[in-house]
Amino acid sequence: MIKLIVGLGNPGPQYAVTRHNAGFMIVDNLAVKLGVNFNAYKNLGEYVKTTIGGQDVFLAKPLTFMNLSGRMVTHLAGFYKIKPQEILVCFDDISINLGAVRIRKDGSAGGQNGMKNIIELFGTQDIPRLRFGVGPKPERFDSADYVLSKFSKSDEKLLNESIEAAVEAAESCVKDGLERAMNKFNK
């Protein structure tokens, strides 16, 4: 059962609408849908306790920059006695086409440094994740430059629709369980 949904991103207005902040966008939109506001958490990020489908769940956004995301996630999970298998980490993935959603129970970080840090600090790859497609990366772009670039105007409609689908997928992971959510959203 998912007890903590984490959105990965970078703090600061200069990163607000970049591909690397897709995780923040998902969790922010979920918070709006649920009518809750984030609170500061130990200078490491923001979080809020809420309910989805009658189940208590935390939403969290580490504000330590992407590469140090695990600091907040492991601290929050330890404090509330949440196992790595009960966490859903939402993040961008340049290997997936823009707007596609992929849910996995476990696996490697796949080159995503925030997820890599979380895996390292927990000492396990057994952490569910929701990967949000921000690709494909054009040949002329360096990966780091691409994920830190803003979405184009032409991508905005698809982005908004896809973020809503990702919010539904995250809710489904809590309400229906990972297997059913994967069957519904992994296409």
UniProtKB/Swiss-Prot annotation:
InterPro entries: Pept_tRNA_hydro, Pept_tRNA_hydro_CS, Pept_tRNA_hydro_sf. Gene3D superfamilies: Peptidyl-tRNA hydrolase. The keyword Lyase does not apply. It is an enzyme of class 3 (hydrolase). GO terms for biological process: protein quality control for misfolded or incompletely synthesized proteins; rescue of stalled ribosome. The record marks 92 as: Stabilizes the basic form of H active site to accept a proton. Keywords: Cytoplasm, Hydrolase, RNA-binding, tRNA-binding. This is Peptidyl-tRNA hydrolase. It comes from Elusimicrobium minutum (strain Pei191).
